[in-house]
C-alpha cells in the first residue's frame, strides 16, 4: 500500500501536519511512502516541497489534492524503478493538538478555514 502524507517525512509524522508546520514555521510538502507497521514510517518513494504560503489549512489541502494525480504518478514511477528517497530531515511525530497548541497556531496567524474557502469547496462538490 502507498500512503500520501502532507509533510516532508520523516518530520511531522502523525496527525495534522500542516497545523504543526505552521506553528514551527517549517517547510510544507507532501510525501508518498510505502505503508508498514509504524505510523508514517515506510520507505519514501516521492517527496515534493510546497513553497506556496497558504492562508488556511484547507487551502493547503485543496492545493495538495489538486496536484495529487501528478504527484501520485511520479511516486508510482519511482516505485516501479525501486527508487527510494533517503531523507536527512529530523524525525518528529505529532498527535492531536491541545488548547495551548491551538493558541500557538492562532498566534502564528494560522487558520483552519476562511470564509472564502467555502466557495472553493462548494465549486468542487457542486453537482
Where do the model's predicted regions map?
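Donor/substrate-binding cores of folate-linked one-carbon enzymes
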Residues: 1-101, 105-113
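N-terminal targeting/leader regions
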Residues: 113, 120-121
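C-terminal accessory region of SF2 helicases/translocases
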Residues: 118, 124-127
